[in-house]
Every structure is written in structure tokens, then in C-alpha cells.
């Protein structure tokens, strides 16, 4: 099972990833901690949502589906958000596969991180007690010819509307309320995220 952080060439970051050694019939086998947790159907979304992160998470989701289509998958999220297209690649894969995907926010789920948190299976979306959630409208920047600005402005507005539609679906809120509440950065504590419908419960202890 490959290391989901294999693309990280930072020696300091790599040195901080613990290794787990297991005894097998064929002798010792070592895993980095993330690969070992993947065997337990646990995926981590940490840091910015970027294309290479989305590719790894989508691959992990598809792999776990092929292993056991009936067993839940768990995604732990601690992310400031990031690329909309990368986030939508993760979102679409979560909705496409057969297993329920349970989402858990630890630390912070902001922007696309909050969107993915809300898109977990109904009844299986959670926050840890001191986690925070932040929602806002998509951010866009463009440099180029003046004639192209209108094209990109229309695309940003269309993306904003689509994400508001999906967030309204997953939270049960009216789209008008979502549009109003995401007009500026909107921070929520764990209990407020439950009230808003982004998550279903706050987890304090494992049952």
C-alpha cells in the first residue's frame, strides 16, 4: 500500500511521519502511519486542497471501495480549503462510490474543507469539540485581456451558484440563506456547525 504522502520531498516533514512495525507470518512489515490507517479505512485531508491531494484521496476512495464496497470510509479533515476543481474531484468521488463516507472535522475545515465536511453521508458527519468551520463564497482571481474578464466573471458566478445549491442540499438550508451566509467569511464553532446542518454531531469520546 503506497504512502499517500509520497510526493512530499520535504525531509523535515517526512522525518515527522511515524512508522508502524507489525509482525506478520513472513516477518516484520513497516508502514508509515497514514498507510497503516488506510488499512482501517481512514483517510486524512490535511492542508490545502490541491490537484495532487485530490488525486491521492480519490484513488484512496476508489481503492477502499474495491476492497469492501459495504464498509464505511472515514475522512478526517483539517484544511484551510483550496482549489475548487480539486475539491469537486474529491466531492464527486465521494458521491460516486458505494460505501458511505463519514467526515470528521479536527482543527479547522474552511472553505472547500467545510464543503467536503458537509458532503459526508447523512448522519455520519462530525466535528471534534474544539474544531471550527468556516464557509464563504468562492474566491477568484484573473490576469489577462480585458475581453476575457467577463467570461471569467460569469464562470465564477456560475460556480458560486452551483456550490450554494450543493451546500443547501447537504445542510437542508434554503439557497437564499446559503448565499447570504457565505457572502463573507462565516466562522462557526462545532455546536454551531451542528445547528447549521454542516455536521450531524460533536464527538467528544469514541463509543
UniProtKB/Swiss-Prot annotation:
HAMAP family: ClpP (MF_00444). The gene is clpP. The keyword Ubl conjugation does not apply. Cleaves peptides in various proteins in a process that requires ATP hydrolysis. Has a chymotrypsin-like activity. Plays a major role in the degradation of misfolded proteins. It comes from Psychromonas ingrahamii (strain DSM 17664 / CCUG 51855 / 37). GO terms for biological process: protein quality control for misfolded or incompletely synthesized proteins. CDD domains: S14_ClpP_2 (cd07017). This is ATP-dependent Clp protease proteolytic subunit. InterPro entries: ClpP, ClpP/crotonase-like_dom_sf, ClpP/TepA, ClpP_His_AS, ClpP_Ser_AS. The lineage of its organism: Bacteria, Pseudomonadati, Pseudomonadota, Gammaproteobacteria, Alteromonadales.
